């Protein structure tokens, strides 16, 4: 069972992916993790990727697909996997198909932009411990202070509204096109992945319940 989760940053994909991994005993495959592992292990693809990255270039889709093929051939992927942050573009999705890497389920977690901004821009972190709070959903006992040490909380650059809106714009420009691509594939029928869209405004538990119902079919 191979799964792609789609949705904007902050939609809750990471949380749901962890729950899926635990229930179905499948790994979450991140292209970033694969790249780092291949470079660390000095594989042929890893050495190629390292050379490209050191020269300031972008790793090609062809290289990434090669890493994906290597990774899904490993024993822990025998029951399937969840793709994390991949594919991001239609050419990458088409390259997966060309290489015969089938996908069983594509699930979109839909959350409006303004809710994403609210979720992410409200996060505050205690730098020393990594503890994370939220000004609305999980506020500290004293505003702006860590519960345990009383030290100042900070807003990470990634959680600033301007940065979040840039990430959302990038998602809408690139990754959102995959929604139409996979909806079309699902409608075509035979040997195509199923496509489901879930309302990500609901609780983690409600989204999880729907996800499991889809995957248990």
From Swiss-Prot:
It comes from Acinetobacter baumannii (strain ATCC 17978 / DSM 105126 / CIP 53.77 / LMG 1025 / NCDC KC755 / 5377). PANTHER family: NUCLEOTIDE KINASE. One of its GO terms (molecular function) is ATP binding. Belongs to the adenylate kinase family. Pathway: Purine metabolism; AMP biosynthesis via salvage pathway; AMP from ADP: step 1/1. CDD domains: ADK. This is Adenylate kinase. Residues 122-159 are annotated as: LID. ATP binds at residues 10-15, 123, 132-133, 202. AMP binds at residues 31, 36, 57-59, 85-88, 92, 156, 167. GO terms for cellular component: cytoplasm. HAMAP family: Adenylate_kinase_Adk (MF_00235).
């Amino acid at each position: 069972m191979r799964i792609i989760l789609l949705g904007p940053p902050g939609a809750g994909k990471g949380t749901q992916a962890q729950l899926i991994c635990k229930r179905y005993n499948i790994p979450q495959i991140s292209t970033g993790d694969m790249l780092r592992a291949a470079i660390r292990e000095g594989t042929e693809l890893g050495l190629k990727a390292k050379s490209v990255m050191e020269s300031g270039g972008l790793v090609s889709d062809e290289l990434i697909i090669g890493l994906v093929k290597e990774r899904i051939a490993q024993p822990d992927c025998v029951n399937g996997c969840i793709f994390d942050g991949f594919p991001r573009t239609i050419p990458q999705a088409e390259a997966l198909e060309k290489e015969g890497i089938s996908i069983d389920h594509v699930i979109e977690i839909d959350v409006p932009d303004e809710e994403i901004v609210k979720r992410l821009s409200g996060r505050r972190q205690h730098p020393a411990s990594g503890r994370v709070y939220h000004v609305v959903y999980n506020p500290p006992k004293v505003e702006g202070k860590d519960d345990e040490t009383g030290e100042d909380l900070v807003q990470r650059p990634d959680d600033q509204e301007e940065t979040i809106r840039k990430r959302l714009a990038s998602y809408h420009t690139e990754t959102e096109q995959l929604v139409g691509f996979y909806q079309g594939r699902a409608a075509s029928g035979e040997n195509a992945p199923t496509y489901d869209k879930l309302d990500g405004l609901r609780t983690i538990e409600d989204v999880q319940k729907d996800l499991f119902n889809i995957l248990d079919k």
